[in-house]
Regions:
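Hydrophobic alpha-helical transmembrane segments
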Residues: 99-102, 140-178, 233-240, 277-286
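Loop-to-helix entry and N-terminal half of a specific, functionally important transmembrane alpha helix
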Residues: 30-35, 149, 225-232, 274-277, ...
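TM-adjacent membrane-interface loops and short helices in multi-pass inner/ER membrane proteins
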Residues: 164, 194, 382-432, 438, ...
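Hydrophobic transmembrane alpha-helices and their immediate junctions
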Residues: 214-216, 220-224, 447-480, 648
Length: 819
């Protein structure tokens, strides 16, 4: 007979995650360190570069410690922990699918890193779930979030006022763009160095402050939240984020229904109060900020801070007085009205009407925006669907869906968009992010991954709302904060890559775990049997062993990074063999393709200087191996072309260039390389008197020209507001081999028209001299003056004038191959 649950033993076990517990303080210390310190590592952007990756790896150490603490807690209180919501484990389905997607991933390394990141998210989710079931945990987590968000906001304003170093105490060398120049404006970006993501973060913080003001009973907390509301709102405006401005009212509609009708009135009063104060202060904040970034003076900076902090303090006092003296009476008068069904949706509905009116006021020809600083007013007036950021996002999404169609079930693995987008892109833009979290995830883990994500979100939000409606007002504050954070960032992430910042991703999944922790699940049918079974040790054991494995994997990767860093710093002080051995050590521990590319560069340079065949052989062996592990890492194509050039293997170069053109149809450099290779092959064939073969090579150059011309015409069909992206068409570099081909064939008029494009008197490219000589020769053949060109060439290279003159005479004397 199954043993019944011993509720007293379950209750007594809860002390393991309260203030009396060592585990409790270890977990909170890790959370304080992560949420307060790690955002200053560029927000932990997953930027697919070693200098970004190392900070993410250090965060995984925190994750391993948290997972170990969870394992110990769940082992020592396994009977208590098992009566919790069993659906909390659904979060692990997402990293599981990322693991599955690694099997056929287009990038071995970046799919591995993404898998590790999602394990970290799952750990934060589980940590929040267990920690915030205790009131002590709820309170400390709330203070950690509000404190860290306030630091980020104030740090942003420090940068806006021209100096965040605290009088030289912190150099902040990684934050040159915390206030970022953009298209003639300056946009506030704080630690994220990306205005749109900072706007999403600020939306969450703004609404968290609003809820705290109207719900919290702690007067000091209310004062603090009221004080931070104005700096956060001013910062939000200074991001100049049109996406943030347009999603703000949408998120407000998702947030307000959590409050009773009377508290919605209070929240709107506080928001309008802060908005009025912000608009009053905005002209001086804007002008002082722009001035201080150009010329920082202590007196002006002090004045700017006095205005900001003074205005915030006055607003906080008014907000506090309203809550103390007006809100209480408002609650009493509307007490019966609050209980009516659906009344909480009344103000959101009115908000939609107000939003339409506000949009007309701001976007219509009303002159209202003239009251705002010019940079902000112009930005608002330019909000429409026919602007480059909107059109480009539409292109990204369309191209991403094309990728997904080829990898529909489990996706192409982590980092797939960055690896594949150039093969599918509609025009030659450069973007390593899809600018939509959900679509990027669809590309990475396909339908299975999206199913796991939406299942997780559905479970969290279902249980959250189910329990939220039963809570008293005093019990609603903490759950509401985590709902606001996750909802605000996820909604904004539909249109941007906020979740590529691991810090924000961790915050979102911590918030989701916290939301689930506020709910209660019914006892499941087989609970008694599970609690009485020895299998209760399985999950704690998996967590403890998993923590050890996760930590080891992380430390190995960190060790590889530092080995690579050591090689880079000491490359001039040691011989090639020592550097290669250290690189091999780094690569064996961390297979970042950038490490491998650095080794290829070192081997190639060594072969070029020594001509020792062993180095060329090793380069080719590595490239053959990488063609399977990292087939879309573009630098490896350049390394292969470079090796072929050094080996004089033009036939292989032509093959590689053609393959590259198929993979990267909008990368003009591969067309150039193919054309240059085919011209060299034509010259070789002429020297061997195989004129038919030479003609075939030359004709292939014209075919490539026609392909490029046709594709360039496609770009003319883009909407006027959409940017083309990278240069594409008959560029100066491509014009040279085309002109040379016409020159060899004796069509000097055509040759001159193309070689004129490649003529560059700056001579800042290796091919510029030969292009100039060909252009001079073709002008001579057309009986046109080439004296100015010759004088320019010989003046630029006086030491080799005789050699250059001999080459020029040889070209002038060359007869067309068709004669």
């Amino acid at each position: 007979m199954a043993n019944k649950i011993n509720k007293s033993s379950i209750s007594s076990s809860q002390h393991l995650l309260t203030k009396r517990s060592t585990i409790f303080w270890i977990i909170n210390s890790c959370l304080i360190f992560f949420f307060l310190f790690m955002p200053f590592q560029s927000g932990l952007l997953n930027g697919s570069q070693p200098n970004y990756e190392i900070d993410i790896l250090y965060s995984f150490i925190i994750g391993a410690i948290l997972l170990l603490c969870l394992g110990i807690y769940m082992y020592r209180s396994r009977r208590a922990s098992l009566v919790h919501n069993p659906f909390r484990y659904v979060i692990w389905s997402i990293p599981l699918i990322y693991c599955i997607s690694m099997i056929g991933a287009v990038s071995a390394h970046y799919s591995y890193i993404e898998f590790m990141i999602w394990i970290f998210y799952a750990i934060l989710f589980m940590t929040a779930y267990h920690l915030l079931r205790q009131s002590d945990g709820q309170q400390i987590a709330f203070y950690i979030y509000m404190g860290s968000a306030s630091v980020i906001v104030l740090f942003g304003m420090m940068n806006w006022f021209g100096n965040a170093s605290l009088w030289g105490l912190f150099p902040w060398e990684v934050y040159p763009d915390a206030a970022m120049p953009s298209s003639g404006d300056v946009r506030l970006t704080s630690v994220f160095q990306y205005a749109n993501t900072y706007a999403a973060y600020l939306i969450a913080f703004l609404f968290a402050c609003l809820f705290t003001i109207v719900v919290s009973k702690n007067k000091y907390v209310v004062l603090f939240a009221s004080f931070m509301l104005v700096p956060a709102l001013i910062s939000f405006i200074l991001t100049l984020s049109r996406g943030g401005w347009t999603t703000f009212p949408v998120i407000l509609l998702f947030v307000l229904p959590l409050l009773t009708f009377s508290k919605q009135i209070q929240a709107l009063f506080q928001l309008i109060l802060a908005l009025i104060a912000s608009v009053i202060m905005l002209p001086s904040m804007n002008s002082y900020g722009l001035q201080l970034q150009q010329d920082h003076t202590q007196g002006t900076a002090l004045l700017a801070w006095i205005i900001l902090l003074g205005g915030s303090l006055v607003t906080a006092v008014i907000a506090f007085a309203f809550q103390k003296y007006v809100a209480t009476r408002l609650e009493q008068k509307l007490q019966s009205f609050n209980k009516r069904k659906l009344v909480m949706f009344l103000i959101p509905m009115l908000g939609i009407v107000a939003g339409i009116a506000g949009a007309f006021l701001l976007l219509g020809n009303t002159g209202f925006t003239k009251l705002l600083p010019a940079s902000i007013g112009d930005r608002i007036e330019n909000i429409n669907f026919n602007q480059h950021s909107v059109l480009e996002r539409g292109t990204f999404y369309e191209d991403a869906l094309s990728i997904w169609k080829d990898y529909p079930i489990d996706g192409a693995g982590g980092g797939a968009w960055q690896a594949l987008y150039q093969q599918y892109q509609n025009n030659p833009y450069s973007s390593t992010q899809v600018h939509s979290f959900f679509i990027q995830m669809l590309v990475e883990v396909g339908a299975l991954g999206m199913l796991a994500l939406f299942l997780t979100l559905a479970i969290v939000y279902y249980y959250f709302f189910k329990s939220y409606l039963k809570k008293t007002d005093d019990e609603k504050l903490m759950p509401s904060i985590w709902y606001i954070i996750s909802t605000a960032i996820l909604i904004h992430s539909v249109l941007d890559f906020n979740m590529s910042y691991v810090y924000l991703g961790a915050l979102v999944f911590f918030s989701l775990g916290a939301m689930l922790s506020s709910s209660e699940a019914k006892t499941f049918l087989w609970q008694d049997k599970v609690l009485s079974n020895k299998l209760t040790i399985v999950i704690p054991a998996i967590f403890i062993v998993g923590a050890a494995v996760y930590l080891i994997m992380t430390l190995v990767n960190i060790s590889g990074y530092h080995s690579f860093n050591t090689v880079q710093k000491s490359i001039q002080e040691q011989n090639v063999q020592q550097s290669i051995e250290q690189l091999d050590n780094a690569i064996s521990r961390n297979g970042d393709p950038e490490y491998i590319d650095y080794k290829l560069e070192l081997l190639t340079r060594t072969y070029e200087s020594t001509l020792e065949e062993q180095y060329a052989i090793e380069v080719q062996e590595i490239l053959d191996k990488m063609s399977k592990q990292e087939p879309y890492y573009e630098n490896f194509i350049f390394r292969q072309l470079e090796l072929n050039r050094l080996l004089g293997n033009d036939e292989e170069s032509a093959i590689v260039s053609k393959i590259a053109i198929n993979k990267y149809p909008w990368e003009i450099d591969y067309y150039v390389e193919f054309a240059k290779t085919q011209f060299r092959r034509a010259v070789t064939a002429i020297g061997e008197d195989d004129l038919q073969l030479a003609n075939e090579y030359l004709q292939s150059i014209f075919e490539i020209r026609d392909v490029v011309t046709a594709k360039a015409l496609e770009l003319e069909l883009l909407p006027d507001a959409q940017l083309q992206g990278r240069e594409f068409g008959i560029t100066a570099k491509l014009a040279m081999p085309i002109g040379q081909a016409f020159f060899v064939l004796g069509d000097y008029v055509q040759a001159a028209s193309y070689l004129a494009l490649s003529w560059d008197p700056a001579f800042d490219d290796n091919d510029d001299v030969m292009a100039a000589l060909y252009y001079s020769a073709v002008l001579q053949k057309l009986n046109q003056s080439n004296e100015e060109i010759n004088n320019t060439i010989f003046a630029a290279f006086p030491d080799t004038q005789e050699d250059l003159s001999a080459i020029l005479d040889g070209l002038i004397g060359t007869l067309p191959i068709n004669n």
